[in-house]
Amino acid sequence: MSTLIATARKPSPPPADTASLAEVAYARIRQAITDGDLKSGASLRETAVADWLAMSRTPVRDALRRLESDGLLAHEAHRGAVVATLDESAILELYAMREMLEGSAAALAARHGREDELDTLRHIAAEEAGALNDAPRLVAINRRFHQAIFRAAHNRYLLKMLNPVHDGIAIMGRSTLADPARARDAHAEHLELVELLARRDAAGAEAVARRHSRGSLDARLKLQREIAKG
């Protein structure tokens, strides 16, 4: 069995009444990737994954093909399916999409977000202030903050486009929020964004969301170059 698969958290057995084992396999492998249990470059051999998930190879094969189509997996000669690795060109493309989509989400949230949704964002931002020196907790809170904005945008099609973008960011591993300076800057941008949403300033909210994404890109490129240097 692949060492990386062996060290990933063992999922619970698939439910006996599931309509599609392939769907279960897809969801569980995807979660292991986006949670960071399966790292970029990890090999996912059918037999090892089937043993890990306690199911046959057929649904696993279907799930791996679907994840490859999503861009979370790549196929390498002599290794088979591996968790995708993004080069700098792909990172730039990914963050260009993030900037555009998150800017649109912020503008839509300013126009359509309900007061209770804006209250939720205020509470999350306040919680975030107490987690700036706790990277794992901060990453989880940051995810909740952005998901709350996406929901407040009230656009199902935008959500469908954002999900693969954030999946792509997740496979890069270590969060840029582990850098204390970036954590402080990101929190300040979140507070600014909450204020603009409360004022229903769509143009201002979009501008800050785009700036926030560019700041994240700068931090990501710095981190990737540090990793490359070893």
Segment roles from a protein language model:
Residues A25-A27, A42, A54, T58, ...:
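Short alpha-helical segments used as structural interaction elements across diverse proteins
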Residues M1-R111, L221-G230:
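Short linear motifs at protein or domain termini
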Residues S69, L73-A74, V165-D167, A181-R184:
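Mobile beta-alpha loop/short-helix "lid" or hinge segments that flank ligand
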Residues A32, G36, E128, V165-M172, ...:
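A short secondary-structure junction motif
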Residues L94, R98, R111-S175, H187-R199, ...:
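Conserved amphipathic alpha-helical segments that form helical-bundle/coiled-coil interaction surfaces
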Residues S2, W52, P180-G230:
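C-terminal regulatory/effector modules of DNA-binding transcriptional regulators
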